[in-house]
Amino acid sequence: MSQNDPKIDVKALGKVAVLMGGTSAEREVSLMSGGGVLQALRSRGVDAHAFDPAHSDLSELKAHGYSRCFIALHGRHGEDGTVQGALELLGIPYTGPGVMASSIAMDKIMTKRIWRADGLPTPDWRLVSSSAETAQAFQELGAPMIVKPSREGSTIGLTKVTSLGQCEQAYRLAAQHDPEVLCEQFIDGDETTCPILGQGAEARALPVIRIEAPQGNYDYQNKYFTDVTQYHCPSGLPEAEEREIQRIVVQAYRTLGCRGWARADIMIRASDRKPFLLEINTSPGMTGHSLVPMSANASGISYPDLCLRILASASLDALQGRAGAAGGREPV
């Protein structure tokens, strides 16, 4: 796709608000994502403007004549269905999945339940509400175990627990961010991620990225603010493994009813090379360290053209019909 791609009429996109910042724990990252998207869209001739919901009421979007929104918000009140619901009421098309899919994907526990019911592989888990239950989960799931808030992103509030004595502190940290705490079996192996673009039968996976972080610690700092993490795209995985990851993430995306774009995180167990879905991000990062632009670039889509393509896919649940709002759950 190029600036002059006849499929996308830039003028028809109208006045665009890039929603960035917000009030979640991921505000800083969102501002970086939104700044990059804003610059990219303007470079393609889009009438794009920054809009921070932390400083302006969403109702102002209608009053100021915005015709669509690029959601570059991350975390709560950004990719959890709340902003999407407000935009539905305002009648302003927005990027990414709709209200229900966004809400479900933000909830890691609900997401895992749906994936498991659909036969998709995801690590065993327990939902806990106390440090004692966390200790019990550790005894059942074994070491190491991941403890994290059910509804946060960017590894915020996450602890890798290797001993029973760590359970209380790990629970307290996660519970600071969410009353629902997820204890998840740790999968030892290759960490990968894979973006998806499109909707329903047209949804397609982009190239897989393999991630190598220092001591396997792909935390908030290593994700966004250091250059020590290594990203491999092409992934270097056997072709059959890459195809299987792409097949699984597209099915996971469709099962949740996603549209527009998302990025799924997958671990490949070292012992038998089996892939396990960890979570799906419905408003992925678009910073200089972000992975969707990296994967898109490997498939020949530049950062500005990626932003333009995502923006052009903006829609409303109300425009989809019931089947479309559910993402068109066709078999893969």
Curated annotation (Swiss-Prot):
Q: Which GO BP terms sit in this record? A: cell wall organization; peptidoglycan biosynthetic process; regulation of cell shape
Predominant cellular place of this UniProt entry's protein: cytoplasm
Among InterPro entries, the record links this protein to: ATP-grasp (IPR011761), ATP_grasp_subdomain_1 (IPR013815), D-Ala_lig_Van_CS (IPR000291), D_ala_D_ala (IPR005905), Dala_Dala_lig_C (IPR011095), Dala_Dala_lig_N (IPR011127), PreATP-grasp_dom_sf (IPR016185)
> Per its UniProt record, what SUPFAM superfamilies does this chain match?
Glutathione synthetase ATP-binding domain-like (SSF56059), PreATP-grasp domain (SSF52440)
Q: Which domain of life is it from?
A: Bacteria
Q: Which Gene3D superfamilies match?
A: 3.40.50.20, ATP-grasp fold, A domain, ATP-grasp fold, B domain
Membrane-spanning residues = none
Q: Which residues form the ATP-grasp domain?
A: 112-312
Q: What is its EC number?
A: 6.3.2.4
What the record notes about the co-factor is: Binds 2 magnesium or manganese ions per subunit.
Q: Name one GO cellular component term.
A: cytosol
Question: Which key words are in the record?
Answer: ATP-binding, Cell shape, Cell wall biogenesis/degradation, Cytoplasm, Ligase, Magnesium, Manganese, Metal-binding, Nucleotide-binding, Peptidoglycan synthesis
* Annotated Mg(2+) 1 binding sites: 265, 279
Name its cellular compartments: Cytoplasm
In which residues is Mg(2+) 2 bound? 279, 281
The family assignment reads: Belongs to the D-alanine--D-alanine ligase family.
Q: Known HAMAP family for this protein?
A: Dala_Dala_lig (MF_00047)
Classification via NCBIfam families: D_ala_D_alaTIGR, PRK01372.1
> What functional role does this protein have?
Cell wall formation.
The molecule here is called D-alanine--D-alanine ligase
Which organism is this protein's natural source?
A: Acidovorax ebreus (strain TPSY)
Its lineage reads: Bacteria, Pseudomonadati, Pseudomonadota, Betaproteobacteria, Burkholderiales
